[in-house]
Structures are given as structure tokens and as C-alpha cells.
Amino acid sequence: MMTPEFFMEIEKKTFSPYAQLTSASKGRERPEETSPVRTAYQRDRDRIIHSKSFRRLMHKTQVFLSPVDEHYRTRMTHTLEVTQIARIVARALRLNEDLTEAIALGHDLGHTPFGHAGEEALRTCYDPTFRHAKQSLRVVDRLENDGEGLNLTFEVRDGILNHSGKALAATLEGRIVKFADRIAYINSDIDDAIRGGILSLSDIPSDLLEILGEGYSERINRMVLSLVEGSTDKNEIVMTEPVGEATERLRAFLTDRVYINSAAKSEEHKAKDLLVSLYGYYIDRPDELPPLYRRIAEEDGIKTSVADFISCMTDRYAVDLFRRLFIPDVWRGGAV
């Protein structure tokens, strides 16, 4: 039988000197018995995959709000794309693929319904510093497993928290996920924007297409190769130039043309208003919260509890709940 000790010996013999060894993990906040067949990071990965928050990602917006066309990305498909890219890079660099996979699978667990519109709604009504990365950590630490949390290792928790923004993860594996996230959403969002008629390939600056490629697969391959070449035998994760600079310019282009000013964003104000209304409703009626969130309200405060409840909703659940709470139902009484 291949035991965790067997895998950890292989790590010591084959991994890069810059890799995070499983045997060197800082461990969990609550000590546990070890598994006879899985390493700590493999167990973290499995806990995330089997969590309710992970399953809900399939019904959360990536860019397009609740699209009718089922070919548009969701938070779930985005997460799987990030995971695939991150694993390729980690393997090529001889880093810890299990750790990388666990971070990638968990990085968006705390994302709100309606994508970044939901995040902005909670910044408005709850906390100006609300970030989905911080909420993702709260999900795995506090909300999952009926309020007990998943008790993940320090390195996975750190990678989830620091997958976005300026802060760097403590491990190279966590830093890979930050780049994989960008590579995935840049290219999938272009693909979805073209599908939705919001963007055409000719709209993208020609010099960027020349550097990065015109096709979806070509761009991903060039970005991944740039990341691997720039990071090989180094204690950092970086892209080579000119691909790195072109990637950032392409991201800025998408921010202006898709994320802020496109027709896909025309309904976002409704999504924000919907979530703000739900937040206000439950702030005034905490007794109507589900049992878990009533308990959290007693321990962490009502504002935090309501924000937790809302951030865990799917797009569909939020819309249905709003309709039930605020839209009068049709009278179905008998005829006079």
C-alpha cells in the first residue's frame, strides 16, 4: 500500500528545492489523526470538493449574470479551469501539485452571487473592505461543516486568502494559483464576450494578439509557457517578457471593454439592489435566518451573519428569495 509516508519520500527526492513539502506543513489549527492513504494536502483537496460551497459554484455568476445559454462560464467551470492550469505549472516546476490543486479548488468558495456585482453590494451595505478572497477563507474556516469549518492546513488557507490582490502567498504553489486565476479568467472572459456579441477579436489591440496569439488555446499555451520559463529554478513565480506585460495590458483592456462598460453589465445595478434589499431585510429580522446563521449572529454579530448568508447564496436562490419576500404572490382564491 502506498502510504502518505511513501508519497512524502518521493517529494523529498523529486521536488524542486523551492517546493512546499507536505512533511514541512505548518499543520492544522485543530490536530487530527493522519490518514493511512492520503497526505494532508490531498485530504484538504477532498474536503473542498465534497463541500456544499464547492457544489454551489455551479450556480454562481462568472461574468454574465445568470445566462440562459449554458455554454457561458460559471464560478464552477472557472474554478476547474484555474485548477487545470495551476496543476500544469506546478508539475512543470516540480512544485507540490496536491497543494496547488487544493488552493485552486478553494480559491473562490466565498464568492458572492452575481459575481463582482455581489461583492460590491456587500461593500456598500456591510463592509467597504469586503473581499471574496477573505470570505473564501471564512467559508473554509467557519461556515462549512455546519459551522465547524474544514480545518484545512495553513498553506492551503494562506493560498486561498492571498490568491488575489497585492499580497503574496507564503508558498510558490499559492502564487501559481494567482497567475492561473488571471490566465483562466482573461481567456475565458474573452471567449464568453465574443460568444455574447460584446466583443470581437478585431477589437483586441493587434500587437497583443501578435504576442499572445489569436486563438483561445494558443493564448493560454503561451501564457503558461511564459510562466514556466520565467519561474524555472527560481524562488519566485513570474512571467517572461513580453508576454507578462502583454497579459497585463489585455487584462486592462477587458476591464474597460467588458467588466465595466459592456452591455453584460447593464443589469448589475439590479443585482446589487436585490442583495442590498435582502441584507436589510435580514438585519431587521434575524429570527428568520436559517439556524446556522442565527447561531453565527449570536457569536459574531448580526451584520457578519447576514453577510455570510448572502455570500453563500447562488444567483438563482437570491432571485427566488427576493421574489418570495418582496413580490406579491398571485391570489389563487375561488371565484365569487
Residues covered by each model-derived region:
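Aspartate-rich (DDxxD/NDxxD/DxxxD) Mg2+/diphosphate-binding motifs
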Residues: 98-125
